[in-house]
Amino acid sequence: MESEGIEHRTVQVNGINMHVAEKGHGPLILFIHGFPDLWYSWRHQILALSALGYRTVAPDLRGYGDTDAPASPSSYTCLHVVGDLVALLDTIAPDQEQVFVVAHDWGSIIAWYLCLFRPDRLKALVSLSVAFSPRNPQRKIIKSLQAVYGDDYYICRFQEPGVIEAEFAQMGTTRILKEFLTYRNPGPLFLPKGKGFGRPTDAPIVLPSWLSEDEVNYYATKFEKTGFTGGINYYRNLDLNWELTTAWTGAQVKVPVKFIVGDQDLVYNSPGAKDFIHKGGFKKYAPLLEQVVVMEGVAHFLQQEKPDEINTHIHDFIKNFH
């Protein structure tokens, strides 16, 4: 990828060293990746949008890739991660008071918090896969998930430090990444102990046309070095984030938004999600929600599966805000 003019550097922000990939000049687009992912998730968008006259910036979030991974699980709250990104923008683009944000998966969760905490910093948001989720003051998140899905649900299995990491280590880094990146079951993801992803760990995984062995190997090289703990720590802070954000109960997102999701995405198919997105709930909490796009036959990693369409969707939206 370096040969295509993507520049890499390390920036000191918020007490950590953050690795950033960037290319291009013009209005800044900040790309925020999810789990288990890297700046690399946005490789197609970086090339396309920089060619259209934007400065594309894609960091590895704390805990990922070539960015520092603090040891304490409680160093991965929404306040830490939003703090990293605001500090990054202050450092690399002090002249750009507002930027575009494109986010996916956990990156979208972080982007929604960014909208709540610092709406003054965003021109517009394109959120992929994960819609805004209003805070329920009555019930903590993990208890809610356990009540709906049971203890084998992947987010519940992620809670106990070290447990899922040991199971992932047994299966092997490359295998885990292939399982996640190629996951197309629209139903919830269960990871029962000792059962992995529900198929024998020596069963071959055929990669889709949009994901090559070389691309998987790039991921594997980075995750071999870091392990999965940094990324999983985000899930371990769901309840702490809930506690820390009491003051934002009922708050609206006052940023222009475009939301894009695949109809095979497990998040889109979770209980209540479609009704919330399409029947007024989403628009109530994000009154500047301008477009909802549902991509047929597309699963969770849509920016990699359908890069050309996603690039067009991003550009068609953000060009209205110059």
Question: Where in this protein do the model-derived segments appear?
Answer:
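Flexible "cap/lid" subdomain of the alpha/beta-hydrolase fold that forms the substrate-access gate
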Residues: E2-E7, N17-M18, L28, Y64-V102, ...
